[in-house]
Amino acid sequence: MYNLKNQVIVITGSSSGIGLAASTIALSSGAKVFGVDIRPPPSTLTSQSNYACLQYDLSSSSTVSDIVAACEGAFGPRIDGLLNIAGVMDLNQSADTLADEIWERCIAVNLTAPVKLMREVLPVMQRQGGGSIVNVASKAALSGAVSGVAYTASKHGLVGATKNVAWRFKHERIRCNVVCPGGVGATSIRDGVDVTQFDAAALETMALIHQAHGCDREKGVELQPQDIAHMLLFLLDERSRGVSGAVIPVDNAWSTI
């Protein structure tokens, strides 16, 4: 399906949602997948000989170098691709209602962890002569009207980091892109989020934007995790070798408003 045979791909958020879909498709394309998730992986992954994983809390303040070390222990000193998919939501809190713990968790998981992982993976890619990094942001990275200030800031920051990495390493055959999904069915990003604690006033101001996208479900065209996963894996494939520094919405045109 994709030209990934024997390539080593690190995927965060690999146990569910977009990460699980990407892991499954990558394995079917012949890749060696190293998954990272706070949750244990499903048996559909652990039964695969080319899959290894590390249960890891990306919100912790510890270094992520042990992720790369564990991957190299499983598959050797090579990393061809990195998919930074893991993410957490906020409570749609505005700057005037924002709780410190919400801000710190969103920034830690959605921005700090991906940047630290890129820092650890880039030297490996430099030594081997190239690689591809794909970060997952959100419609919230393209707008200020779809989520809270913590999630919005973290995803805007990830877009900026992506562009910086793409330009800095463009002559070393290392590509870096960011995909911005819209609403996706059957994902776990809201797991553990108490929706009754959402900032009601903020949600009210965003209602029209969410309604414009919510009708996709009613029309039967709601995006599924595999729809996002296919874009991610295309960006790892050599057929996308001219694409770097791109910000790519996958959202049924939601980003047009």
UniProtKB/Swiss-Prot annotation:
It is an enzyme of class 1 (oxidoreductase). Pfam families: adh_short (PF00106). Belongs to the short-chain dehydrogenases/reductases (SDR) family. The gene is ausX. SUPFAM superfamilies: NAD(P)-binding Rossmann-fold domains. The lineage of its organism: Eukaryota, Fungi, Dikarya, Ascomycota, Pezizomycotina. Short chain dehydrogenase; part of the gene cluster that mediates the biosynthesis of calidodehydroaustin, a fungal meroterpenoid. The first step of the pathway is the synthesis of 3,5-dimethylorsellinic acid by the polyketide synthase ausA. 3,5-dimethylorsellinic acid is then prenylated by the polyprenyl transferase ausN. Further epoxidation by the FAD-dependent monooxygenase ausM and cyclization by the probable terpene cyclase ausL lead to the formation of protoaustinoid A. This is Short chain dehydrogenase ausX. Pathway: Secondary metabolite biosynthesis; terpenoid biosynthesis. Signal peptide: none annotated. NADP(+) binds at residues 11, 57, 119, 151, 155, 184. GO terms for molecular function: oxidoreductase activity. In A.calidoustus, the austinoid gene cluster lies on a contiguous DNA region, while clusters from E.nidulans and P.brasilianum are split in their respective genomes. Genetic rearrangements provoked variability among the clusters and E.nidulans produces the least number of austionoid derivatives with the end products austinol and dehydroaustinol, while P.brasilianum can produce until acetoxydehydroaustin, and A.calidoustus produces the highest number of identified derivatives. The keyword NADP applies. Gene3D superfamilies: NAD(P)-binding Rossmann-like Domain.
